[in-house]
Amino acid sequence: MKQLHDLRALPLVSIAAMMAAVPALAQTNTSSLDHEVVLSDLDAPWDMAFLPDGTMFFTEKCHGLSVRLPDGTVNALLGVGDTAGYATNGEDLFCEGQAGMMGVAVDPDFADNRRIYVYSTSNMSDPHTNRLMRFEVNGDLTDVSGRTDLVDDVPYKMEATDQPFGGPGAHNGGRVAFGPEGHLFLTTGDNHNAEVPQSPTMMGSKVLRLDTDGNAAEGNAPPEGFDPRTYTYGHRNVQGLAFHPGTGTPITAEHGPWHSDEITVLENGGNGGWDPRPNMAGRGDCPDGYCGYEPNQMEGMNRYERRAYMPMTDFETYPDAMPPIWTNNGWSQGISGAAFLEGEAWGDWEGAMVVSYLGIGFGGTPVGERIDVVELDEGEISVFDVTEMTLPMESQRFRALATGPDGSLYVSSEEGMIHKLTPTD
């Protein structure tokens, strides 16, 4: 599948910044794939994290945190609200709209400290917030204890607004991951609040880089006046985060506002360039003060016109914004998960990035439920090639990707399944 970029209707500065994002002609699969359904009948599985022996922690948005042991046994650890069947329940945790239990990460020193980290929505405060919590897992992996709320001030959307997908609980980000240097990363979203992305103090629309106690990681370099936990800001709703295997550089996958899904190489202190405020960049007022969906609420705009009217990365206003290395040919198809393929069995794709899509099938947008393999140039992090993976199962709304310790690619779907894809000769 060839991915090109129609650069009409873009400012010249945008064209210059995006020229590097045009990949070459895609190749075919380098290997065939074996397919196994690891789990099914789940409630919107959101994320996965592994121990070296193949033990898999996973979250379900409205149910909670569970663990699958290597023998296939599943233990339900932490329930959302009063969800039955869990060893422990977080009574303040709830799900609504896009919100609920989202990301999970395993501490690099888990063998010694038994710690895991979970990002979930909480009604402990009013207004409600999204929280990054730390727990200890007991020795036989049947329960968690010792809850510590490391980050308790990520905003949550309390009320419905006049936008598509405008209900409560929108745009929370949600990915939690450890970088190769041991820092803990958390991605957050804009809640359909136009003031959040460029705010120095509101913790939505950010990528936070933390130590394991929730403090700002040493070396963070946000602009003056910003919360020191900020690694990057000006994001819309990052849900994909992975680290380049050669450099350790964090790379995000972020779905756009009915145009321009993006893959972006993060820069410490960088601005993602998302600013949906009214009366900016030539725009006037917008419904409920949020312009992020306004072009979608106006008839007759194609994806290029929408991109020019409400840019995902606004280079005119923020000429030093981090440029995306790929923009999905101007479409927004719900890019979500991100990972890197590991192991020689992947052939030419070893070390390539993979991204998943939830799919959006209205307003002229192709549905796009798929997994793409994004090959990066050696020596610099730019896109060389993008190939749609030929899947041995039917496409679904693919939420998350994770590389297991066995080198297989694990894929969660909104249809309640976790798939395992293993390359074969």
Give names to the regions the model predicted.
Residues 2-12:
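Bacterial N-terminal signal peptides that target proteins for export
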Residues 11-21:
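Bacterial N-terminal signal peptides
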Residues 22-26:
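Sec/Tat signal peptide C-region and signal peptidase I cleavage site
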Residues 27-195, 248-252, 256, 331-379, ...:
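Acidic, Gly/Ser/Thr-rich repeat motifs that build Ca2+-stabilized beta-propeller blades
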Residues 34, 161-162, 227, 387-389:
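Short, flexible loop segments at the rims of nucleotide/cofactor-binding pockets, characterized by
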Residues 85-95, 99-101, 109-111, 131, ...:
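Beta-propeller domain segments
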Residues 174-176, 240, 399-401:
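Short, surface-exposed beta-strand/loop micro-motifs that present aromatic residues
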Residues 381-405:
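Conserved blade-ending motifs and adjacent loop-strand segments that build the rim/top face
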